[in-house]
Curated annotation (Swiss-Prot):
Active site: 43, 349, 352
Family recorded in the similarity comment: Belongs to the 'GDSL' lipolytic enzyme family.
Protein name: GDSL esterase/lipase At3g05180
Glycosylation (residues): 294, 330
Record key words, sorted: Glycoprotein, Hydrolase, Lipid degradation, Lipid metabolism, Secreted, Signal
InterPro entries assigned to the protein according to its UniProt record, in alphabetical order: GDSL, SGNH_hydro_sf, SGNH_plant_lipase-like
GO MF annotations in UniProt: hydrolase activity, acting on ester bonds
Extent of the signal sequence: 1-27
CDD domains from the UniProt entry: SGNH_plant_lipase_like (cd01837)
A GO cellular component annotation in the UniProt record: apoplast
Top enzyme class: hydrolase
C-alpha cells in the first residue's frame, strides 16, 4: 500500500519533473569576472584530491584521452566538467588542496573536492575521509595560511590568492550524489527520502561557514540521474520491474529528483539569509537526462553501458572488477579494459562519465539556459 509520504512525494515530484524538463528561468553564464575559483565536491570534480590524500593514483586506464602520464588523479578518461568550465573562463585547471608537487599555483583558486565524498560526515565505512565539512575546514585553513604568508611577503601574490581573490571568487559545489546512492545499500526508499532534509541541513551549515569567511558568490550543481549509472543498474536493477522504460532504476532517480527539488528550495532561501550574496543553481539533472534519453541524437552509441569494463552488453560492468583492474570473478580471471572509442559512450567506468559526456554537459551549462540566479546584492 502506498504510504501518505509517498503520495505527497509524488505530487512534489510532479512539480519537480515539470520544472526540470525545460531550461531554468533567470539564466546566468559563468564568466571570467571571478578572479579565482574554489571548488567543493566528489569525484565529479575531483582533480586529484583523494589520490593525493590517500597516496594512490587511479589505474593507468584513467585519463588516457587527455592528461595521459603521469595521471592527475581524475576519475575519468580525460577532462571533467569543472575542467571545461575553467577552460571557458580562461582559468587554469584547479589544483587540489593536498597536491604537494605540481607545476600549477594556487593563485587562481583551489580544489577541495575528493572522490567518494559525501555532504554527511564520513564514518568508519566511508571510502573518503574528506566529507563536505572537512573540505570547508580545509578551505578555512588554506585561506588563513595564505593570507599570513602574503602579509609576510607580498611577492607571494604571484602564486597565491589575495584577500580580494577570496572575497570576489566563485565558490562551486557538486556534491550529494554519494549521500543518496550510498544510502540505498542500507535503507528503504522511504528512509532514503526522509534523509534528504538532513543532508541539506548539513550542506547549509557549510555554506554558513564559508559565508563567515567572506564567500559571496556561490555556484551549486544539483545531482544527476543516479538510477542511470551502470553500477546502480547492475546492483539494484536485477528486478526489471524496478527499471523505467530507459533502463534506469526508478527509485534512485526518484530520490535524486527529491534531493534536487529541496536543494532548489534551499537555493531560493539562501540569499534572504546572507546579505550581499549571489547564488546560482545549475540543473545538471536535466542536462544529463537529456543526454541519456537522447544519446543517439547527440552522437553517442551507448547511454548506460560502460566504456571501461568487462562482461559485454548490456552493461559491460562487473562491480568486482574496476576499470583497468584484473581480478577473479566467478572463478575466471578477467580484466576490465577501455573501449576502442570512448567518445561514443556516456559512461566511462560504471560510475563516472566520459570526457565526451562531460564536454556535452559543460557546453550546455555554458549556454546559461540551465542555470538560475538568486541574489541579495546591493547593486
Amino acid at each position: 500500500m502506498e504510504t501518505l509520504f509517498h503520495t505527497l512525494l509524488r505530487l512534489l515530484l510532479f512539480v519537480a519533473i515539470s520544472h526540470t524538463l525545460s531550461p531554468l528561468a533567470g539564466s546566468f553564464r559563468i564568466s571570467n569576472d571571478f578572479p579565482a575559483v574554489f571548488n567543493f565536491g566528489d569525484s565529479n570534480s575531483d582533480t586529484g584530491e583523494l589520490s593525493s590524500g590517500l597516496g594512490f593514483l587511479p589505474q593507468p586506464s584513467y585519463e588516457i584521452t587527455f592528461f595521459r602520464s603521469p595521471t592527475s588523479g581524475r576519475f575519468c578518461n580525460g577532462r571533467l566538467i569543472v575542467d571545461f568550465l575553467m577552460e571557458a573562463i580562461d582559468r587554469p585547471y584547479l589544483r587540489p588542496y593536498l597536491d604537494s608537487i605540481s607545476r600549477q599555483t594556487y593563485r587562481r583558486g583551489c580544489n577541495f573536492a575528493a572522490a567518494a565524498s559525501t555532504i554527511q560526515k564520513a564514518n568508519a565505512a566511508s571510502y573518503s575521509p574528506f566529507g563536505f565539512g572537512v573540505q570547508v575546514s580545509q578551505f578555512i585553513t588554506f585561506k588563513s595560511k595564505v593570507l599570513q604568508l602574503i602579509q609576510q611577503d607580498e611577492e607571494l601574490q604571484r602564486y597565491l590568492p589575495s584577500e580580494y581573490f577570496f572575497s570576489n571568487g566563485l565558490y562551486m559545489f557538486d556534491i550529494g550524489q554519494n549521500d543518496i546512492a550510498g544510502a540505498f545499500y542500507t535503507k528503504t526508499v522511504d528512509q532514503v527520502l526522509a534523509l534528504v532534509p538532513i543532508i541539506l541541513d548539513i550542506f547549509q551549515d557549510g555554506i554558513k561557514r564559508l559565508y563567515a569567511e567572506g564567500a559571496r558568490n556561490y555556484w551549486i550543481h544539483n545531482t544527476g540521474p543516479l538510477g542511470c549509472l551502470a553500477q546502480v543498474v547492475s546492483i539494484f536493477g536485477e528486478d526489471k520491474s524496478k527499471l523505467d522504460e530507459f533502463g534506469c532504476v526508478s527509485d534512485h532517480n526518484q530520490a535524486a529528483k527529491l534531493f534536487n527539488l529541496q536543494l532548489h528550495g534551499l537555493f531560493k532561501k539562501l540569499p534572504q539569509q546572507y546579505p550581499n550574496s549571489r547564488f546560482t543553481y545549475v540543473d545538471i539533472f536535466s542536462i544529463k537526462s537529456d543526454l541519456i534519453l537522447n544519446h543517439s541524437k547527440y552522437g553517442f552509441d551507448h547511454s548506460i553501458m560502460v566504456c571501461c569494463g568487462t562482461g559485454g552488453p548490456p552493461l559491460n560492468y562487473d562491480d568486482q572488477v574496476g576499470c583497468g583492474k584484473t581480478a577473479r570473478s566467478n572463478g575466471t580471471i578477467i580484466t576490465a579494459k577501455p573501449c576502442y572509442d570512448s567518445s561514443k559512450y556516456v559512461n566511462w567506468d560504471g560510475i563516472h562519465y566520459t570526457e565526451a559526456a562531460n564536454r556535452f554537459v559543460a557546453l550546455h551549462i555554458l549556454t546559461g539556459k540551465y542555470s538560475e540566479t538568486a541574489s541579495s546584492l546591493n547593486l
